[in-house]
Amino acid sequence: MKKVYFDNAATTRIDDSVLEEMNLVMKESYGNPSSTHGYGRESRVIIEKARKSIANEFNVQPSEIIFTSGGTESDNIVLMSAVQDLKVKTIITTEIEHHAVLNMVKHLKERHSVDIKFLKINNCGQISLKDLRNALDSVNSRVLVTLMHVNNEIGSIT
């Protein structure tokens, strides 16, 4: 029987060409890119080449591309930076947001007195755009909206 994978919102199979390149790099260019020895410099060149390639695809500067270890670290960096650097005072989200976001939002509320507004979701796991507009209109401070576009646990698409 042929298997079919339907959970691509959670994790997606790596393309064969990407996997081949990753294996080659991990076998032959495994130096710490922060080190000054030859292996480290070689790894740094590979990383910076990848950064430039991605930046070109998105028409941004390479310095705007940040590599992280995964989704949780990415969520934490964005949320913490929004509060500390951009002076966001209100975050609008939902109770079904990814736990990494919800945990950081809770932390920001407790430690930085950020106001959190939770939008209601319907029985399909979607928000009302009217509710979002009302929440935005009720805020007199800098605001960040964080909403999961595709929920891999319940299958909703917002």
Which role does the model predict for each range below?
Residues 1-158:
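Pyridoxal 5′-phosphate
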